[in-house]
Amino acid sequence: MHRSQPLLALAKSLNDYSNNIFKPLADQAGGALAVQQLARAVLPESMRPEVTLGDGAGTDPRNRLSPRAAVRLLEVLDHELTAQGRNLTDILPVAGIDPGTLQKRINGPHEVGRVVGKTGTFGDYGASALVGAVPTSDHGTVYFAILNHNVPVPEARRRQDRFVAVLLGQLHSSPWKYERDSRPAVQRAELVSLSP
């Protein structure tokens, strides 16, 4: 038996950097079709056609995800985590705090720690996405999805960050209750003997 960091810590680390290292394992467990079926199962019937996955790395031209389906999937994930005494900060990066794709984004003085989210990028002039959540005192958690296509990635990110800055100002957001765990999430696994 191997002992490693908890699964949530590993998932968080992988999501911080948008790492696809588990794609080969996922392929053996049913691949994109299995993930597509799971995603569609938690969506209302009318949204199910809005999720089509051709692969697990975002490179297949058949991949399709609508912004409203992305928001609904994030909302479902949030509710599942809440039911287990967790929240989105346990599995997704917090902008301006966690290392990775959101560390240097959405990090102004009134923005740091107020957005948890997931990025996605394909090519330099292909696709760029930001799906996230913002805690507010008046509206609860507000979810958003920004999916850009055929826009240079730096420009898409600039537009996404600007949209989020306006959203934060309009919603009078509050920071997530979050303290970054500085221990390495991915470290050498320990071999544990099962015999007494």
Regions inferred by a protein language model and the residue ranges of each:
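A small/polar active-site loop signature that marks catalytic segments
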Residues: M1-R86
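C-terminal soluble interaction/assembly domains
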Residues: T52-P196
